[in-house]
């Protein structure tokens, strides 16, 4: 407690406040007791009992770690107590003209977007209140598009309610699951500088009982400097571990290769999805290492061919590479348990195959390689390659013409790629485990009717197009170049 009986928090405890407020953390049992009182009231928005100086110091802490997209300018403790813009983005699109939400709202490129600290369970009811503020800013509303999720004026001003975190700088090309992690899932976003300036200049809150001890209720709540990534505590039984620091992918590939060629048939590579959000100090990283976000990215990486007779020890532990900062990694040897929890993988994600030194990945593809010793070119039908330190440009000369009289009869599924040039795609399986296709050229015929390329899955079709539609046919076949 501070001298006036208000609850304060020491600066060395700010890391726990960040842990519990920037992320969506449900279990606070491992937060130190001396920090729980402040953090609990902070999350409940019971600011009457909190020390304003501590709030001001915490703002300075967020700036000191260079929290990404945090708004600039003078921020007083009011930024925590009222509806205020806290993060600034720019809706910037290089390849599309508009951003379309599920709610059918459209935002023009270049529009400044401010994420506020207001969250609601019912955007429809809250929209009428925010609209009353919108009318104070914009008198001419002739081209306003109003829905249950907001109001946008000429595609460049107004407000919308959307998910806690929206990637305003990217383009979502495929469906992604919504993070359903709280009962106030919709955040208020202000569009345009005028709307943001209005909420900065005025201390605004939705109607609520004046004598309420805290602002939060079933309809809305304030979540300050909140991103909302769901966080859980790690329960791995760590047998051994090591840390290494590098900005070179090849160092990471070497460490993975070392494990795959010793006693581990696979490894898991995790990249935490917040590592670019700030310049995290060492003490904060140590705390965050005890947790994991469910939305982090995980790759399941296996050898190109897994031996059938693995030793018993291989099944007792697994190796996890944890990228917990931009240039910091942990290699964890953990006991294999059914209770181990890892970041979710999408249903359509397959294992990555670590490319060995006898193979060259083809430039511009994720699943095609050339084997110089065997002189074969293959396209993986399900998996993708990982770990290439150099790539090879495709050239038709890579397809060695096989002369035969009579023609070699191919069994199984055979696809006609170019009958005139006698190029075919033949279904193949490596080591009885990895489904693929071989791209061949020569005197071949199929024992059954040739299949159409339209029958291939899109993963293989796209790679074929990448290889066969050549912009510059004079590219040298054996020019290997460093991957970026």
From Swiss-Prot:
InterPro entries: Baculo_Y142. It comes from the Viruses. This is Uncharacterized 55.8 kDa protein.
């Amino acid at each position: 407690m501070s001298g006036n009986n208000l609850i304060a928090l020491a600066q060395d405890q700010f890391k726990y406040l960040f842990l519990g407020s920037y992320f969506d953390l449900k279990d606070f049992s491992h937060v130190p007791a001396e920090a729980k009182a402040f953090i609990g009231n902070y999350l409940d928005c019971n600011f009457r009992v909190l020390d304003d100086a501590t709030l001001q110091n915490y703002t300075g802490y967020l700036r000191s770690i260079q929290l990404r997209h945090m708004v600039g300018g003078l921020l007083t403790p009011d930024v925590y107590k009222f509806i205020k813009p806290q993060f600034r983005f720019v809706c910037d699109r290089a390849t599309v003209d508009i951003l379309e939400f599920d709610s059918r709202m459209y935002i023009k490129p270049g529009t400044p977007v401010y994420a506020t600290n207001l969250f609601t369970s019912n955007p429809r009811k809250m929209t009428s209140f925010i609209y009353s503020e919108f009318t104070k800013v914009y008198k001419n509303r002739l081209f306003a598009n109003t829905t249950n999720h907001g109001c946008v004026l000429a595609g460049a001003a107004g407000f919308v309610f959307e998910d806690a975190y929206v990637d305003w700088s990217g383009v979502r090309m495929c469906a992604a699951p919504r993070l359903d992690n709280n009962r106030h899932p919709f955040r208020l976003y202000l569009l345009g500088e005028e709307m943001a300036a209005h909420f900065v200049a005025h201390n605004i809150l939705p109607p609520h009982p004046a004598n309420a001890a805290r602002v939060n209720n079933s309809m809305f709540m304030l979540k300050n400097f909140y991103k909302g990534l769901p966080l859980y505590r790690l329960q791995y039984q760590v047998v051994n571990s090591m840390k290494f620091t590098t900005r070179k992918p090849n160092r990471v590939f070497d460490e993975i290769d070392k494990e795959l060629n010793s006693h581990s048939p696979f490894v898991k590579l995790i990249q935490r999805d917040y590592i670019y959000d700030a310049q995290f100090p060492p003490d904060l990283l140590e705390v965050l290492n005890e947790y994991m976000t469910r939305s982090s990215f995980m790759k399941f990486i296996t050898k190109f061919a897994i031996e059938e007779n693995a030793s018993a020890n291989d099944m007792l532990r697994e190796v996890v590479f944890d990228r917990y900062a931009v240039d910091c990694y942990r290699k964890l040897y953990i006991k294999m348990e059914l209770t181990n929890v890892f970041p979710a993988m999408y249903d359509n994600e397959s294992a990555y195959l670590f490319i060995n030194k006898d193979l060259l990945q083809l430039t511009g593809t994720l699943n095609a390689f050339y084997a110089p010793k065997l002189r074969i070119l293959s396209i993986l039908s399900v998996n993708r390659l990982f770990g290439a330190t150099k790539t090879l440009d495709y050239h038709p000369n890579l397809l060695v013409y096989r002369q035969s009289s009579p023609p070699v009869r191919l069994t199984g599924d055979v696809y006609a790629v170019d009958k005139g040039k006698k190029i075919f795609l033949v279904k193949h399986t490596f080591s009885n485990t990895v489904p693929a296709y071989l791209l061949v050229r020569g005197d071949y015929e199929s024992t059954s009717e040739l299949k159409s390329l339209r029958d291939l899955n899109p993963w293989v079709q796209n790679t074929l197009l990448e290889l066969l539609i050549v912009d510059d046919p004079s590219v040298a076949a054996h020019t290997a170049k460093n991957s970026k």
